[in-house]
Design a protein with these regions (language model features):
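A short acidic-Thr-Gly-centered motif at the start of a beta-strand
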Residues: 1-6
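Broad, structure-driven detector of short, well-ordered beta-strand segments within folded domains
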Residues: 20-24
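Low-complexity intrinsically disordered segments
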Residues: 36-111
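A short beta-strand micro-motif
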Residues: 10-15
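An extracellular/secretory-lumen and virion-surface interaction module
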Residues: 16, 26-28, 34-35
Length: 111
């Protein structure tokens, strides 16, 4: 039951090539949609979303970080601009558990 409650604070932003797992406005993991592999060292991981960007032809409009299909995520540090978001959903249990396994397999840094 605890894992289900914890999962609710996460959102999965799906783009053409990647899935961005967000905890609030912080990216905690990026998964390649083709291979299903989590990239914990992706440029967006640990970054806060600065804004969302919506392209309308030549015009670009920025708006606050609210889940919107059709807009792109913009991470200022890096910078990283994703392709358009195709879907936003709560990660299912398998996705969340797969991400946790990827995190848990990382070597612990020496202090």
């Amino acid at each position: 039951m605890r894992r289900d409650r914890e999962r609710r604070i996460y959102k999965l932003f799906v783009t053409r090539n990647s899935e961005y797992l967000m905890r609030g406005d912080v990216c905690v993991g990026v998964r390649d949609r083709r291979s299903g592999t989590w990239s914990i060292d992706h440029e967006a991981v640990t970054q806060v979303v600065a804004t969302m960007v919506h392209r309308q032809g030549e015009r670009v409009r920025m708006h606050s970080f609210t889940p919107r299909v059709g807009s792109a995520l913009y991470f200022a540090r890096g910078p990283v601009l994703t392709s358009s978001v195709r879907a936003v959903r709560r990660p299912d249990r398998a996705t969340y558990d797969d991400w946790r396994r990827a995190i848990d397999s990382l070597p612990v840094a020496a202090e």
